[in-house]
């Protein structure tokens, strides 16, 4: 409700944000999207990949691009890192931290900030959504809401007939 979506991209981001990893960032996203809070400039590489999401890592692809661009980690290894975080493979995670931090420091980022960013990536990547899934769910959600708003009787008839064999669900 606080997001006040004005375009499909807002619904796409909402789908990705409502996950355990990035969920804590919803208030900041909404505030920045609606112009109540300025988007902070962190580093040109991070800013480039998070511009469309108001300075917040929302999609797995953004995280991979940041790991690649800032940490000088090849994209295939960035993908492997994202998957390792999701599966809690600490050996892979721990092997990539110094690579990422060193790459970020070489690109002008403070070492402490680079470590904090890696920690944020760890928190996000375990639950983050990729953009293509968010797009699919957002389009389906939008179409469903539109049908329910403009053709409520037909929508409810279709919803009931899809659950025809589940009388418990039809009663609620």
Language-model segments: which ranges?
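Noncatalytic, beta-rich nucleic-acid-contacting surfaces in large DNA/RNA-processing enzymes
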Residues: 1-172
């Amino acid at each position: 409700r606080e997001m006040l979506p004005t375009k499909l991209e807002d619904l796409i981001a909402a789908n990705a944000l409502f996950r355990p990893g990035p969920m804590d960032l919803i208030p900041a996203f909404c505030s920045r999207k609606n112009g109540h809070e300025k988007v902070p400039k962190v580093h040109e590489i991070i800013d480039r990949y998070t511009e469309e999401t108001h300075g917040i890592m929302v999609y797995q692809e953004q995280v991979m691009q940041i790991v690649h661009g800032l940490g000088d980690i090849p994209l295939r290894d960035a993908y492997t890192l994202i998957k390792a975080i999701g599966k809690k493979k600490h050996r892979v995670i721990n092997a990539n931290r110094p690579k990422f931090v060193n790459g970020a420091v070489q690109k002008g980022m403070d070492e402490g900030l680079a470590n904090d960013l890696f920690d944020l990536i760890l928190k996000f990547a375990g639950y983050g959504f990729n953009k293509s899934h968010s797009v699919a769910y957002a389009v389906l959600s939008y179409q469903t809401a539109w049908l329910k708003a403009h053709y409520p009787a037909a929508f409810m008839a279709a919803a009931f007939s899809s659950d025809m064999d589940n009388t418990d669900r039809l009663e609620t």
